């Protein structure tokens, strides 16, 4: 019979030790034994709470931005998948909350940003929230590392080459390799995007498809035949002082 006092002591000791480990080390620890796996599988445990409070900006934890990732562990994961300050146009900066990009008001420029982590395997979904005016062109989608992040003029940069795929929210057009691939979604009088709406981007690296959801409604497959390359969440914008947030959600739920 297990002494409950001893069990509690072991739990508290593990909690303290795990709180001081790096996140990569926690991943390895979860594979040591079933006990440690179940301990770390509690996504709202004090261990994940401690790491969350110490790594995430307080501004993001106090906002509604992370409402779709309710546990401490999923908030941490979203933070490490957010926009990359090192992989964006020179006219873009990432705000202190870590999840929102701001495009500076630079004339005759189109500017883009990619997420920190790209995907080549599995199924992934993330939310994009355009929190400022769209302007004449506002594109969300994916790109490889080879796709350009800045160009002259006000154009649909994302989707302008063979390394990027995008949905222009202003005109409801799909874009790839510089061509308009058709209207999207395939609805009569499809409603235009409203600032502040959350769009879910669904990347399936097994079926090589990209799809979108809006207001929890699946809009259909937008692109098929995606290449076997690492693909990154990406947006491109033209409007000065507009802001776009991205929150990684993990594996999409079917149904």
UniProtKB/Swiss-Prot annotation:
Q: Which UniProt keywords apply?
A: Neurogenesis, Synapse, Ubl conjugation pathway
Among PROSITE patterns, the record links this protein to: B302_SPRY (PS50188)
Q: Cite the Gene3D superfamilies for this sequence.
A: 1.20.1280.50, 2.60.120.920
A cellular component term from Gene Ontology for this protein is:
neuromuscular junction
* Domain F-box as annotated: residue spans: 3-51
The pathway that the record names for this protein is:
Protein modification; protein ubiquitination
Instruction: Give the protein's biological function.
Output: Required in the presynaptic motoneuron to down-regulate the levels of wnd and restrain synaptic terminal growth at the neuromuscular junction (NMJ).
Assembly state and interactors? Component of an E3 ubiquitin ligase complex composed of hiw and Fsn.
Protein name (Swiss-Prot/TrEMBL):
F-box/SPRY domain-containing protein 1
Q: What is the lineage of its organism?
A: Eukaryota, Metazoa, Ecdysozoa, Arthropoda, Hexapoda
What gene codes for this chain?
Fsn
């Amino acid at each position: 019979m297990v002494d409950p006092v001893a069990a509690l002591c072991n739990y508290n000791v593990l909690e303290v030790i795990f709180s001081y480990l790096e996140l990569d080390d926690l991943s390895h620890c979860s594979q040591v034994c079933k006990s440690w796996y179940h301990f770390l599988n509690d996504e709202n445990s004090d261990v994940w709470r401690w790491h969350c409070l110490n790594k995430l900006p307080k501004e993001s934890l106090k906002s509604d931005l992370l409402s779709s990732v309710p546990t401490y562990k999923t908030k941490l994961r979203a933070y490490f998948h957010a926009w990359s300050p090192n992989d964006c146009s020179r006219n873009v900066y990432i705000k202190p909350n870590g999840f929102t990009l701001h495009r500076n008001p630079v004339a005759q420029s189109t500017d883009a940003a990619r997420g920190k982590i790209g995907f080549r395997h599995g199924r992934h979904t993330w939310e994009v929230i355009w929190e400022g005016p769209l302007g004449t062109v506002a594109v969300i989608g994916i790109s490889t590392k080879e796709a350009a992040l800045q160009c002259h003029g006000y154009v649909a940069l994302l989707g302008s080459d063979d390394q990027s795929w995008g949905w222009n929210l202003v005109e409801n057009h799909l874009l790839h390799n510089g061509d308009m691939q058709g209207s999207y979604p395939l609805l009569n009088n499809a409603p235009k995007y409203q600032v502040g709406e959350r769009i879910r981007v669904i990347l399936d690296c097994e079926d090589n498809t990209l799809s979108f959801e809006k207001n929890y409604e699946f809009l259909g497959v937008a692109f098929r035949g995606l290449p076997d390359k690492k693909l990154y969440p990406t947006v491109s914008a033209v409007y000065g002082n507009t802001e776009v947030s991205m929150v990684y959600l993990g594996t999409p739920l079917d149904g």
